[in-house]
């Protein structure tokens, strides 16, 4: 999901061609970034008005609610085609979306209950949510809140800091 203004040049470009790519760079702080991991995800962007996706996005990015109220801001959902992964110098691969993305089929009940699960955990188990962040992820003490849950893990937020706790694979 991307929140984009209609006034932005890239949004105008999307009107002519919906193809897009996003770079995720894991090389911050490395002495030699060429040896670090990064992935470019390619696909197509389309506007989304799905209430569940909007709720998930605004829970993860609380400041975005203000912009969603503006007539010229819209959420776009990317349909991923494939990814170009550089896992370090010379370790380069193309991966198709089916091998990259989690197949959420069979988890519709979790998606439908996500808001209730998050509300319950924050209201009744705030101490546990804080421990997830501090003990399991090594994050600093703070008022950690759960912002999302999906079949692969949970999303946490404390002020401007976010964290992801992945579930163990079985």
Describe these PLM feature segments:
Residues 1-5:
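Active-site-proximal cofactor/substrate-binding loop regions of enzyme domains
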Residues 7-73, 79-82:
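Short, structured beta-strand-loop surface elements
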Residues 69-170:
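C-terminal edge-of-domain segments
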């Amino acid at each position: 999901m991307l929140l984009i203004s209609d006034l932005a040049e890239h949004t105008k470009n999307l009107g002519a061609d919906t193809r897009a790519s996003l770079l995720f760079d894991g090389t911050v702080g490395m002495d030699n970034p060429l040896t670090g991991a990064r992935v470019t995800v390619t696909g197509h962007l389309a506007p989304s008005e799905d209430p569940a996706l909007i709720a998930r996005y605004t829970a993860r990015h609380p400041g975005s609610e203000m912009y969603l109220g503006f007539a010229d801001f819209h959420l776009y959902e990317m349909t991923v085609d494939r990814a170009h992964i550089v896992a370090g110098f010379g370790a380069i691969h193309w991966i198709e979306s089916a091998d990259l993305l989690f197949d959420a089929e069979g988890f519709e009940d979790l998606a439908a209950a996500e808001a209730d699960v998050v509300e319950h955990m924050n209201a009744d188990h705030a101490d546990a949510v804080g421990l997830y962040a501090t003990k399991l992820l090594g994050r600093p003490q703070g008022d950690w809140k759960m912002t999302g849950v999906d079949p692969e893990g949970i999303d946490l937020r404390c002020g401007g800091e976010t964290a992801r706790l992945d579930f163990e694979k079985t």
